[in-house]
């Protein structure tokens, strides 16, 4: 009997979409023979899922869910935009987002292997495989994320282009600033900043940008070169750092200015401390 290794189990799961436990059982029954294990899974009624698992999933939708303690963000992919618009697909996305919010899994792999709360005889991944059979396309849960609520944090979530882009902003200092956080989330959907602030940029990126700037300047005195480079780096910050960007609804304000204005109004020290921008397929 060939050894049933974790790598073999993972390969069978990737080829079939069947849960890890069932893959292990199938391989053990087949004495480690991959093709026989696949054949046995087909005989067990999972043939359609097996046939579709290898297809590329380029389309998809990002969904969110929340409860009193947790916010969940989930991306689910399919083969065609036609299926993404299907109500059955949307229901699956909602169910998965709700499951993530309610169970707060440690990782995507752990989530796929845990029991599905609505049908405890299935793992989440087995539930996904049933949807593949029902809809007739390869469907994959690509990524998940959870965020924990607290008395001193506000979250704003914005969905753009029917869930093709979803953004989230976290503001610390109050749990009553959802409207401000959502406004900034809308801004992020349009401007796609790479970093929260200059302090969050890796040093190698800054060094590279300085080298590029210096390479664009020829024959200038050293003190002039330094000033020009400093100006170019500041322009890089203004373009790529959220807190330095001009607010899309009022370009007389930076995002920092916008938050500071609100801080004065509510009498609390507010700050943007985190943001997320998910784009389907990225």
UniProtKB/Swiss-Prot annotation:
- Gene this chain is encoded by: tsf
Keyword match Ubl conjugation: no
Give the protein's function. Answer: Associates with the EF-Tu.GDP complex and induces the exchange of GDP to GTP. It remains bound to the aminoacyl-tRNA.EF-Tu.GTP complex up to the GTP hydrolysis stage on the ribosome.
Matching entries from InterPro entries are given as: EF-Ts_dimer_sf, Transl_elong_EFTs/EF1B, Transl_elong_EFTs/EF1B_dimer, Transl_elong_Ts_CS, UBA-like_sf
Q: Which family does it belong to?
A: Belongs to the EF-Ts family.
Q: What is this protein called?
A: Elongation factor Ts
Q: What is its main location?
A: cytoplasm
Keyword Cytoplasm present in the record's keywords: the answer is yes
**Organism of this sequence:** Protochlamydia amoebophila (strain UWE25)
